[in-house]
């Protein structure tokens, strides 16, 4: 019955903030906001580690640090949040960020994003959480062209397997997807596949926890 919302707080200098919510029946209550980045913060995306109670990661664009792609570990206790140190996953202009933990490997997650400092390619990196610190492996390109609205999800039935869905700007704005496989901190990708031969916006992906290798992509068909 606990969840976290991460956001840009425009009433607090655009700082990145997060808050714990508690569900009781059909009612919600919230704790106090806790700032995770005391500078202009865009595209915050939060994901919990399903293997570690109360542990989550926020990935975001840190405008106050040259728009680098950055992530931080948070730990929930009651309705309070404590954070570790920030870790950079892309020393370049990053946006359209999504992240997901591997349900089969504690402390392991993937972050996907558009790397504006590398021709706006769709890019991914593996993060490893140890305590309240994050280390990242190398960056891996899954689409050597402009990739918007990137979203990733792991298959909970297959360790290390995930899907990325995105808008392929150089392919008429079509919706494309690709399978990634994690081994340690390296990622290998399969071929890309079109799931919508039309203008595609805001794709999201979810895997069926009861059926291996099955997932659904929802999107705006514009």
Write out the residue ranges for each language-model feature.
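Extracellular, repeat-based ectodomains that mediate carbohydrate processing or recognition
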Residues: 1-222
